[in-house]
Regions:
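Acidic/histidine-rich catalytic neighborhood
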Residues: 339
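N-terminal chloroplast transit peptides
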Residues: 1-21
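Metallocofactor- and cofactor-centric catalytic cores in central/energy metabolism, strongly enriched
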Residues: 2-8, 25-328, 334, 342-352, ...
């Protein structure tokens, strides 16, 4: 696992809290109706006034500002006179939300709300996380990324290009918040199961960090979404006049690695060694390589490899406890051999070793099927990760035949790789 998970390095400690515990942020405001008498006035320690308040999503409360706050902040008359509590504003948003016919329209409503009233946005999300998570993140965020240029309203996050090498520290200094605790970064090359979306991949870091706040209580002003734009190999996007990223083929090799090296060091220099850097949706060729390169140097992890694996293996171990069974008694077949599958497989090997199973024997309990069939020794074009799980067996083309021959006790179909027709 990465430094954030495997070596004990965690987020920076806070006074009066255990090491790594972030203060829980809450968007909740007092519940008062339009004609309710607001509570006693409190000093408003802000330097911003007037439109700078109402147009700042971190400060804006919509019509929940009391009369005293409106007078102190110089916004009296800039918003309608009625006082609407956050509860009432939530009701209004929900009524409008439910009228939308498509999930993409619902996504746009929520993102627009996030851009103007952050407190209300997270109040909406936390009112029913199960309902809104599929809209803010998968699966709807994939559709939103595909239409990112068309639905683009306001920039959110930091856009770094391959041409910015040598200036990343300056760019990070342009970000208005200094106390960043979590960074989610992607280069847009493998967005969910949709392929190379280039700059449009920014929807992934934005959506993931919204869950950091809604589900984990991390202050949104301590979160930074980042898109590393090194070009795209998506010809459709390169021809699209609405595409807002770099319009050239992806840069690979030393120039790409130099950008990543500078980025990792610049983030650590700016925000500290305990700032968590989460990698999202990098292509397989880079994901494992960069994880192995940075995991013991920086506070980072790859969610597609390690995050998915930790949840999947935790579920397996929990099931074993219920059935009073041992992991070593099982044989696993994977449908798919991408980042998620490999991450789960590697963690299963670690769990088997913890039971006393030698590594060589542990790998023999894991059979992997990719788009070309069973991964076996001697098959051409196997990368390093696949070679580890290549079995000494004749080639088999279908999952059905693999199941018949191997007789597994468990079949695992990771997200984005599971072909349901195979089952």
């Amino acid at each position: 696992m990465g430094a954030a998970l495997g070596t004990g390095t965690r987020l920076a400690p806070w006074p009066g809290r255990a090491c790594g515990a972030l203060p829980r942020w809450t968007p909740t405001a007092p519940a008062q109706g339009c004609h309710s008498k607001p509570g006693p006035a409190r000093p408003v320690p802000l330097k911003k006034r007037g439109y700078d308040v109402t147009r700042n999503p971190h400060l804006n409360k919509g019509m929940a500002f009391t009369l005293e706050e409106r007078l102190q902040l110089g916004i009296h008359g800039l918003i309608p006179p009625c006082f609407l509590s956050q509860d009432v504003q939530l009701l209004r948003i929900m009524r409008y939300y439910e009228r939308q016919q498509s999930d993409l329209d619902k996504y746009i409503i929520l993102m627009t709300l996030q851009d103007r009233n952050e407190k209300l946005f997270y109040r909406v999300l936390t009112s029913d996380v199960e309902k809104f998570m599929p809209i803010v993140y998968t699966p709807t965020v994939g559709l939103a990324c595909q239409h990112y240029g068309l639905t683009f309203r306001r920039p959110r996050g930091l856009f770094i290009t391959i041409h910015d090498k040598g200036h990343l520290a300056t760019m990070l200094n342009s970000w208005p918040e200094d106390n960043i605790k979590a960074v989610v970064v992607t280069d847009g090359e493998r967005i969910l199961g949709l392929g190379d979306l280039g700059c449009y991949g920014m929807g992934i870091p934005v959506g993931k960090l919204a869950l950091y706040t809604a589900c984990g209580g991390v202050n949104p002003q301590q979160c930074l979404p980042v898109l590393l734009d090194v070009g795209t190999n998506n010809e459709e996007l390169l021809r699209d006049p609405l595409y807002i990223g770099l319009k050239h083929q992806r840069v690979h090799g030393k120039a790409y690695d130099d950008l990543l090296d500078e980025f990792m060091q610049a983030v650590t220099d700016k925000f500290g060694i305990n700032c968590l850097i989460q990698f999202e949706d990098f292509a397989n060729a880079n994901a494992f390589r960069l994880l192995n390169k940075y995991r013991n140097k920086y506070c980072m992890f790859n969610d597609d490899i390690q995050g998915t694996a930790s949840v999947a293996v935790a579920g397996i171990l929990a099931a074993l406890r219920i059935t009073n069974n041992k992991l070593s008694n099982h044989v696993f077949v994977f449908q798919g051999a991408g980042e998620a599958a490999m991450g789960i497989a590697h963690l299963l090997v670690m769990a088997l070793e913890k039971e006393g199973v030698p590594k060589a024997e542990a790998t023999r309990k894991i059979w992997m099927v990719d788009s070309k069939g069973l991964i076996v020794k001697g098959r051409s074009h196997l990368n390093h990760e696949k070679e580890m799980f290549a079995q000494d067996h004749p080639e088999v083309n279908s999952l059905e035949e693999v199941v018949r021959l191997v007789k597994p006790t468990a079949i695992i179909g990771p997200r984005d790789f599971c072909q349901w027709k195979s089952f």
